[in-house]
Amino acid sequence: LRVSSHLFIERNGRIVQFVGCGKRAWHAGVSRFNGRDNCNDFSIGIELEGTDFVAFEDEQYQALEKLLKAIDARYGLSYIVGHSDIAPGRKTDPGPHFDWVRLHSARSAFGSPQFAGAAARLQLSILEQSFVRA
């Protein structure tokens, strides 16, 4: 079974790391972004505990912002997208309750990545050109 993500943020903001960010995780599955297939090969997956129909906690957003800042410092962020943007029709997350406006407002703290796709998602795939494996 190939199911995993790099990082998971619990409702209380606790961060759990399942896979090192320099390794391949299996969060995206069959996916495509920016003309490239297999997003697991060049992305870092962050899962937020929740569902498509329940709002996320403030603690989760605070933890997400800290993670993005750390990932940007280490790898540099190029794009931030939801799983539904890279696997449309197959993935719905992060869902309509994800606060993309809040994330946009905080992005100066973690560089200036581009936001792509729809404005509401649960699992974030952080895509970056420098993380590509040959």
PLM regions with names:
Residues D37, T51-A134:
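Basic/polar, cationic surfaces and motifs that engage anionic cell-wall
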Residues L1-S78:
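Active-site-adjacent loop/helix surface patches within enzyme catalytic domains
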